[in-house]
């Protein structure tokens, strides 16, 4: 065969084959001619894998090859981006671990410093206690200046060791004072009772009521204040509602009779089993 009857076709960057040009032209002439539209479609170059170890139907067009190359390039870019992200995450994780390690070292150093300071304070306290518990030297052998200095040092140590005592003072309220109830003495008896029988009852022309005073049991009257309350008295005699005449309102001696209703300190007194209650 002549050299011009064969041409070298590179169908793949990694694969190449020698093809008989005349044989390929005869095969193209034997094939029926396609319509013009189909011939235009066949003008596009078709790359086939001419390696005998690969199937002939595995050929692909130039556009498909370019698309495949673009996809491969995009895939490589994505892989590269993913690797960069992983490296950044790994670097960030290493930085965080380094920062955590530095913080732990600082905390450990601070703890050691505190322990060292505590040991120094304890040692200083033990030295002071040993100085206080030293065997005293006879005063005759100690110079006067040394005694003065030691006494001042002892006073200073005692002042430092003194702990202030806090005393809480609670102001308790004074006890309530009992209200003194005014009582009538014999000199303060009203005029209308002077010279009369001091038996525990009052006899008038309109009503007779026998009672005993809660304030002074041997007097037929009690004190009356300028309020709406009146201490009940116990006694017996009579029934139902009785009008009673008493004296002494606000510490002033004034006679009251049952016949004059305008001057009475109260109007009615209702009797229960053992006491009278007064209504003003």
Curated annotation (Swiss-Prot):
Annotated Basic and acidic residues bias: 178-199
Organism, as annotated: Dictyostelium discoideum (Social amoeba)
Name of the protein: Uncharacterized protein DDB_G0286393
Region ranges (Disordered): 20-41, 170-199, 251-280
Feature: compositional bias, Low complexity: 25-41
């Amino acid at each position: 065969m002549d050299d011009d009857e064969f041409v070298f076709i590179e169908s793949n960057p990694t694969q190449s084959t020698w093809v008989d040009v005349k044989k390929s032209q005869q095969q193209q002439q034997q094939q029926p001619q396609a319509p013009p539209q189909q011939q235009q479609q066949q003008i596009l170059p078709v790359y086939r894998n001419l390696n005998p170890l690969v199937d002939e139907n595995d050929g692909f067009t130039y556009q498909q090859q370019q698309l495949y190359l673009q996809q491969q390039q995009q895939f490589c870019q994505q892989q590269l981006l993913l690797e960069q992200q992983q490296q950044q995450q790994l670097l960030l994780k290493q930085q965080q671990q380094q920062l955590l390690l530095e913080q732990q070292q600082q905390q450990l150093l601070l703890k050691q410093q505190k322990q060292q300071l505590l040991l120094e304070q304890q040692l200083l306290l033990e030295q002071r206690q040993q100085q206080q518990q030293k065997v005293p030297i006879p005063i005759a052998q100690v110079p006067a200046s040394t005694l003065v200095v030691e006494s001042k040092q002892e006073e200073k140590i005692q002042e430092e060791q003194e702990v202030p005592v806090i005393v809480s003072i609670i102001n308790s309220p004074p006890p309530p004072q009992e209200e003194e109830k005014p009582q009538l003495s014999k000199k303060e008896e009203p005029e209308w009772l002077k010279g009369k029988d001091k038996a525990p009852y009052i006899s008038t022309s309109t009503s007779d009521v026998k009672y005993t005073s809660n304030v002074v049991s041997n007097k037929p009257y009690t004190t009356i204040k300028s309020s709406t309350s009146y201490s009940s008295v116990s006694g017996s005699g009579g029934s139902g509602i009785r009008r009673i005449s008493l004296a002494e309102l606000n510490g002033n001696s004034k006679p009251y009779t049952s016949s004059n209703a305008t001057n009475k300190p109260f109007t009615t007194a209702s009797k229960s089993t053992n006491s009278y209650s007064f209504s003003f």
